[in-house]
Curated annotation (Swiss-Prot):
Residues at the catalytic site: 143 (proton acceptor)
Keyword annotations: ATP-binding, Kinase, Nucleotide-binding, Serine/threonine-protein kinase, Transferase
Species name: Gymnogyps californianus
UniProt similarity note: Belongs to the protein kinase superfamily. Ser/Thr protein kinase family.
Leading EC class: transferase
Protein name: Serine/threonine-protein kinase mos
PANTHER family: SERINE/THREONINE-PROTEIN KINASE TNNI3K-RELATED, V-MOS MOLONEY MURINE SARCOMA VIRAL ONCO HOMOLOG
UniProt feature coiled coil, ranges: none
Residues that, per the record, bind ATP: 8-16, 29
Length: 200
């Protein structure tokens, strides 16, 4: 039922593959066991599932998850998600994806095409719509950055990689004790840098 096709990338907590699941093209994230920080590995796996029951056009959808398959000595679990391609906003902004390299005669002058105002507005609206939905469900992403915004072939932005996310319980968001230091330091929210509580 699940067949891994090719690697798409890897990060601190695992690897992502293009795969097929019941005949549909999907992305599979295998969360690896960390010998250095086992608790962080487990927390990352379960944090990814914060969005498991949610469906929104601007959020990468979780299809299934398992702590058993595919069996691997080094894997904590597997998360099967909708396949949205492997182009991110990071590729678009910094011209790091081969798909976005346009040559030397472009507006950016660095082998990449500058974003048009229309693209910038559309991408911003997609991201804000996705964030508003997540916040309405009590979920804060905590690692929002261009590399975690995927762009589909149709040009729709989808928020992904919820390994640092946190589900705020009813009334808990007002607690001064709810703060998280996960995520990418250079993209961390100002309130977290100041040691304040998480806000949605």
């Amino acid at each position: 039922r699940l067949c891994l096709l090719q690697p798409l990338g890897s990060g601190g907590f695992g690897s992502v593959y293009k795969a097929t699941y019941h005949g549909a093209t999907v992305a599979v994230k295998q969360v690896k066991k960390s010998s250095k920080n086992r608790l962080a590995s487990r927390q990352s796996f379960w944090a990814e599932l914060n969005v498991a029951r949610l469906q929104h056009n601007n959020v990468v959808r979780v299809v299934a998850a398992s702590t058993c398959a595919p069996a691997s000595q080094n894997s904590l679990g597997t998360i099967i998600m909708e396949y949205v391609g492997n182009i991110t906003l990071h590729h678009v902004i910094y011209g790091t994806g081969d798909v976005w390299r346009q040559g030397e005669d472009d507006e950016g002058g660095c082998g990449r095409k500058a974003l048009s105002m229309e693209e910038t507005v559309c991408y911003s609206c997609d991201i804000m719509t996705g964030l508003a939905f997540l916040h309405s469900q009590g979920i804060v992403h905590l690692d929002l950055k261009p590399a975690n915004i995927f762009i589909t072939e149709q040009g729709v932005c989808k928020i992904g990689d919820f390994g640092c996310s946190q589900k705020l319980e009813e009334g808990l968001s007002q607690s001064p004790h709810v703060c998280q230091q996960g995520g990418t330091y250079t993209h961390r929210a100002p309130e977290l840098l100041k040691g304040e509580r998480v806000t949605a």
